[in-house]
Amino acid sequence: MEEFQGYFELDRSRQHDFLYPLLFREYIYALAHDHGLKKSILFENAGYDNKSSSIIVKRLITRMYQQNPLIFSANDSIQNPFFGQNKNFYSQIISEGFAVIVEIPFSLRLVSSLERKEIAKSHKLRAIHSIFPFLEDKFSHLDYVSDVLIPYHIHLEILVQTLRYWVNDASSLHLLRFFLHEYWNSLITQKNHITIFSKGNPRLFLFLYNSHICEYEYFFLFLRNQSSHLRSTSSGIFFERIYFYVKIEHFVKVFYDNDFQCILWFFKDPFMHYVRYQGKSILASKDTPLLMKKWKYYLVNLWQYHFYAWFQPGRIDINQLCKYSLYFLGYRSSVRLNPSVVRSQMLENSFLINNAMKKFETIVPIIPLIGSLSKANFCDTLGHPISKPTRADSSDSDIIDRFLRISRNLSHYHSGSSKKKSLYRVKYILRLSCVKTLARKHKKTVRTFLKRLGSEFLEEFLTEEEVVLSLIFPRTYSTSRRLYRGRIWYLDITSINDLVNYE
């Protein structure tokens, strides 16, 4: 038991000090502003209110500690227009500053971990698409899978207590606790009995939520390693925006003989495979359903008795992987059996051999994606393209560039799809919606405006992959078509856009 306790206390022993004055530094909000500009990859970013300054933050924190923080004088409202805003505005300013500050100790911890283990190019480990090669490699050999929704009902005090393990600064923790209690109603929304964070203030709460889930995953990964067929000799945990488990060594050195200089290696076969992103986790194994049920109740008890979160066992279903589809990160992933018949001839006798190969498939679900396009006014609910309202001062090139950027971002993200038919339909919707938007602006028919644009306009909606392949294989169309239909996983995608994030 002492060995287990030491495992759990290993990383907690490194507490970092918060510098409380960081809340009043201008560059903290400059970093938050820079993050806001890079966050959106689909639409024109509305920007972050760059008028926020350390003076405003000082006034807000002072008023938070007062008995009536929302009572402002008339002079303040005239001299400073920010105090005429609603309560959400104040919470956004402080939460952005908090988010930048609380990430500093974890960033230092990550850098020191990478330097200690001599791991380079860690940015590729942060890519969302890095999960799919793992699924592609492992899931075709597994039998059972559980799609688990992690409970969101987390008390405020639990979030603060979790952060105390990593931060040794009472002033910042007290301010964080006061801030959460004061602005809780404006920072979360209740939907279908599940607490979700408001889109206006996601960064701080996603960090607090991930730090809370990190505690749970320490326990889970420890139990997982203990139950592996061969224990892991080396492992690394990377705590970032996208947190996942990274195995450094894939083989276990079992035997070494100095005389013959021979090394015997066994491939490590973990008992349970675990993937988590956002509020969903996936557990997969090739063992019997009975063992999967045991792990199911382990998770329920761990959540309820250690993390004080109510978890219904009925929400965890155990399914056969070959008969189940996972809706994960904008893809519908499944493992399908591809039957093949081989004719074998042996002397005068011939017989047929039926083989079934497992293949991991990733398909773009068209119905939810059309729903997202419909909400963004690119098409109606049936998928028919419509014109999108634009500002009168928008130029034609700006409108075309905007539609091209959306189309290429979607093509870039869904490049790992096994079948491109759904993706072609989405590109068709965006292309025709762009034409209708331009025709509406110039008060002309779609046919007339399309003739004016010509075929070059349609070629602009080709992705970079299609253009490159057409240049490499100009005459062998079948070869380029086959290559483009293949899956391509990009390791530079670190955020999921709004149209894909329809779950």
From Swiss-Prot:
Alphabetized InterPro entries for the sequence: Domain_X, Maturase_MatK, Maturase_MatK_N
Gene Ontology terms, MF aspect: RNA binding
Keywords: Chloroplast, mRNA processing, Plastid, RNA-binding, tRNA processing
UniProt keyword RNA-binding present: yes
Subcellular location: Plastid, Chloroplast
Biological-process GO terms, alphabetical: mRNA processing; RNA splicing; tRNA processing
A matching Pfam family: Intron_maturas2
One GO cellular component, as annotated: chloroplast
Assigned protein family: Belongs to the intron maturase 2 family. MatK subfamily.
Function field: Usually encoded in the trnK tRNA gene intron. Probably assists in splicing its own and other chloroplast group II introns.
Protein name (Swiss-Prot/TrEMBL): Maturase K
Taxonomic source organism: Eucalyptus globulus subsp. globulus (Tasmanian blue gum)
Gene: matK
